[in-house]
Structure formats: C-alpha cells, structure tokens
Amino acid sequence: MVENQRAMPQPEMRRIRRIHFVGIGGVGMCGIAEVLLNLGYEVSGSDLKGSAVTERLESFGAQIFVGHRAENTVGADVLVVSSAVNTSNPEVATALERRIPVVPRAEMLAELMRYRHGIAVAGTHGKTTTTSLIASVFAAGGLDPTFVIGGRLNAAGTNAQLGTSRYLIAEADESDASFLHLQPLVAVVTNIDADHMATYEGDFNKLKKTFVEFLHNLPFYGLAVMCIDDPVVREILPLVKRPTLTYGFSESADIRAINVRQDGMLTFFTVLRRDREPLDVSVNMPGNHNVLNSLATIAIATDEGVSDEAIVQGLSGFQGVGRRFQVYGELPVEGGNVMLVDDYGHHPREVSAVISAVRGGWPDRRLVMVYQPHRFSRTRDLYDDFVQVLADANVLLLMEVYPAGEEPIPGADSRNLCHSIRQRGQLDPIYIERGVELAPLVKPLLRAGDILLCQGAGDIGGLAPQLLKSPLFAGAKAAPTEGKLK
C-alpha cells in the first residue's frame, strides 16, 4: 500500500531568507527557483535577457533583473550559479567580496532533497523523459511529488512543481559532475556515453568511476536502478556496493520488456517482473529508447508500492516533454500534410534513437530532417558517428554548429559534415548558412505524408513554431495544447 500525502518537510536553511540565482532563466535553474518560491523563500535572479521562463517566475513573486550587475545581489543571503557562470561575473565577484555564499545549482537541489525521499535520475541520455515519467506515474498513484526536470512537462506546463508528499524527483546532471552533490534514496542510471568529456579530462574511465561514486552516495538501504542493456552500465554494475535493480530487454534484467509493438506515437509492450504477473502497458511515445525509460519508471514505481493500475494509467496518459519528439502540428503541402516534430537530441546516439523511432512508427513515410549540431567540441569528438547516423535521413538540411560559447574548431563544422555525408553516397545534404530563412528552403523539399524533424539543442528550438506560423504554410494546424498534471 502506497503511503499517501505525508506532509513534506521544509528545508532547514538557517539564516537564509533571500536566494539570488545568476542565470535564473536556465533550464536547470528556473525549476529550483520555482520550488523555493513556493516554499516561501524570497527569490531574485538575473539573466542576459527576459523570457517566458523569467516572466513566469516574476508572476510567482521573483524579482528579475535583465543583465548581470553587482547591485543585483543587494540583500541576498546566498547566490546560486550554474556551471556556465564563473568568478568574473560581477554578481559572483561581489558576493565573494562580501562573503556571501556562492553555491552551484546542484548543491541547492541537494539541500531540497536532504529532508525528502529523493529519486535522482542520471545518465547521458533519457534523464528528462525518465524523470517526467516517474513524476507522472507517482501522480497517477495518488502521490503528489515535488519534481525538478530539465524540460517542460507538458501535462504540468512547467519543469518544476512543489508537491505535498515526501517524494522529490529530479535529474542528476553528470555534465559537470555536479550530481555528486546529491544524496538520494533511489538513483537511476539510464546509460553512460562519451559526452561532456572535458569535465573528465577526456578520460572515459574517470567518467565511469564518477558514476560509481554517485551511486555510492546512496545510503546502504538505498536502491540503484540500472539499465543492464547499456554495455558501460553493465560493466560498472559489479562495482556498485548498493542494492540494485536492473531493467532492459535482456533476459537477465529484473524488469524486462517483451512483445514491443509500435503504431505511430503509441508503443505497446509487456513487462515481466520477478514474482509478479506480466503487465501490459502502452506509452504515448515512439521508440525502444522510450520503452527503456518506461521500464526504469516501472521499476521504481513497483519498488515504492505504486499499484499496477496507476502505473498503466500514468504511462498511457503521459503527455510528453517539451522538445522530446514533440509533435507541433501539421504543415499543408500539395496533396496533403506533413507532420512537424521538434526534438532536443544532440548526440549521435540520441539522433539514431529518434530516427529508429520514426522508422518503427511510420515505416512508409520519408524523414526530412533539419539538424543543428551543438558545440564544436562535440562535433569534433563524435564526427564519424554524426556522419553515420545523419546519413540515415531521406532528406537532410544541416544548419551551422550552435557554438554554445565555444570557439570554432577547424574541420568540426557543418560544411565538412555535409561533405563527409555526401561522400558516403546515400544522400546529398543541404548546408544552411547562418541567418538564412528556412521556410522557403524547406517547403519545396516536402511531400504529402513526410515527417519533418527539427532537431538539436541550440536555437533550432525556435524553428518548429516559426514554420507553423510562416505565411508559406498558411492553414497549418497546431497540435493540441497540454493539460494539467493531476
């Protein structure tokens, strides 16, 4: 029987009244700020420009500053910063001079988690979707979890929500190794891949050891939920000296999926659990990678005593996450329509998973892909992998690399990617120079029934809504808006 609606303990941050966020509009920062606002703390924050996110926080009572200035820190008891902010920032420099504590966002998240039943989701890919699925299933089970997610949960219309139960569900970010601040009771590792390697001095073994260290932050009575299908997770499994529960397609998994069938956006499968009856479920997301994300959720929900009925309901009613295979609507073309999809994937493994999902759900449709590589360093380090997976589209348009603050690296750009893909002989990609309007380029390439995928972690996120509103696609139909998480 699930323990329901236990009063959530408040963080005991003595002497802390006003909390200032440097870069409050960031996806990892705004959620924590929103939870703290709802807990009754005074919250202020600065960012280089205003956004819908900062407007939302302002409507909840946050004081928002546009631009970083020393005077923004007046009255702050602590500064919260992301890994992108350094000591040259005038607000950080002023705080250090005045002996105001400056803490990374993960340390503040750890403080919120300290007095709760923390569930932390780690892994190179799938963190946001898995965290969102867990929150949705717990909500369906009558629990009211607090969650902090790295994407917008469509059913809630936000990436964070303060609940009344003891559960706090959050992403654990390995990109800067800040997940080592967290001390959850349950931890998920979805997979381990070569990404953000600068943090680990280019040493993959160091990355693996850091994941083991993260899992050893669990208490001896905690639980590590691990995807046994991932070869690196399988490699570190014997090193984890905590209780473990494995999931995957493998016959050796504790929680296993069989009979997977995909029909468009819907994926159906049967779950096998030790000493339990088989459970038939469906999830409103395509692809085997989302079956794995669902299995992690089922493993945790089962262990926490959530009923099978709530698990089935939470998965089938899941409305997705912003920019994770998000269907924006339909674009009219001669003879019919094109399905417009936006996706955040920016690693070859993520790109491959999405392409496989399209092929599985819509096997007779062409995939027209607009892709924007993210970071020159990632493009350089994974160049051959990008060439291989991007060549699997039917039509490919490559935007220039989104730098994310990096300087260009010779050879690690979209022109060279186009050249290398063209040499494979599978398709002839189109290079898109920065600043070129995309709608006139894309429209002549589309046919009725196509799937148009806009993918990447940079400013390509604004392309799908732009196409939907373009006069060249007059009569475009937007997808239904989200509901509320209950």
From Swiss-Prot:
<keyword id="KW-0131">Cell cycle</keyword>
<dbReference type="Pfam" id="PF02875">
    <property type="entry name" value="Mur_ligase_C"/>
</dbReference>
<keyword id="KW-0547">Nucleotide-binding</keyword>
<keyword id="KW-0067">ATP-binding</keyword>
<dbReference type="InterPro" id="IPR005758">
    <property type="entry name" value="UDP-N-AcMur_Ala_ligase_MurC"/>
</dbReference>
<feature type="binding site">
    <location>
        <begin position="123"/>
        <end position="129"/>
    </location>
    <ligand>
        <name>ATP</name>
    </ligand>
</feature>
<dbReference type="InterPro" id="IPR004101">
    <property type="entry name" value="Mur_ligase_C"/>
</dbReference>
<protein>
    <recommendedName>
        <fullName>UDP-N-acetylmuramate--L-alanine ligase</fullName>
        <ecNumber>6.3.2.8</ecNumber>
    </recommendedName>
</protein>
<dbReference type="Pfam" id="PF08245">
    <property type="entry name" value="Mur_ligase_M"/>
</dbReference>
<dbReference type="InterPro" id="IPR013221">
    <property type="entry name" value="Mur_ligase_cen"/>
</dbReference>
<keyword id="KW-0963">Cytoplasm</keyword>
<dbReference type="InterPro" id="IPR036565">
    <property type="entry name" value="Mur-like_cat_sf"/>
</dbReference>
<keyword id="KW-0961">Cell wall biogenesis/degradation</keyword>
<dbReference type="GO" id="GO:0051301">
    <property type="term" value="P:cell division"/>
</dbReference>
<keyword id="KW-0436">Ligase</keyword>
<dbReference type="GO" id="GO:0005737">
    <property type="term" value="C:cytoplasm"/>
</dbReference>
<dbReference type="GO" id="GO:0008763">
    <property type="term" value="F:UDP-N-acetylmuramate-L-alanine ligase activity"/>
</dbReference>
<dbReference type="GO" id="GO:0009252">
    <property type="term" value="P:peptidoglycan biosynthetic process"/>
</dbReference>
<dbReference type="GO" id="GO:0005524">
    <property type="term" value="F:ATP binding"/>
</dbReference>
<comment type="pathway">
    <text>Cell wall biogenesis; peptidoglycan biosynthesis.</text>
</comment>
<keyword id="KW-0132">Cell division</keyword>
<comment type="function">
    <text>Cell wall formation.</text>
</comment>
<dbReference type="Pfam" id="PF01225">
    <property type="entry name" value="Mur_ligase"/>
</dbReference>
<keyword id="KW-0133">Cell shape</keyword>
<dbReference type="InterPro" id="IPR050061">
    <property type="entry name" value="MurCDEF_pg_biosynth"/>
</dbReference>
<comment type="similarity">
    <text>Belongs to the MurCDEF family.</text>
</comment>
<dbReference type="GO" id="GO:0008360">
    <property type="term" value="P:regulation of cell shape"/>
</dbReference>
<dbReference type="InterPro" id="IPR000713">
    <property type="entry name" value="Mur_ligase_N"/>
</dbReference>
<keyword id="KW-0573">Peptidoglycan synthesis</keyword>
<dbReference type="GO" id="GO:0071555">
    <property type="term" value="P:cell wall organization"/>
</dbReference>
<dbReference type="InterPro" id="IPR036615">
    <property type="entry name" value="Mur_ligase_C_dom_sf"/>
</dbReference>
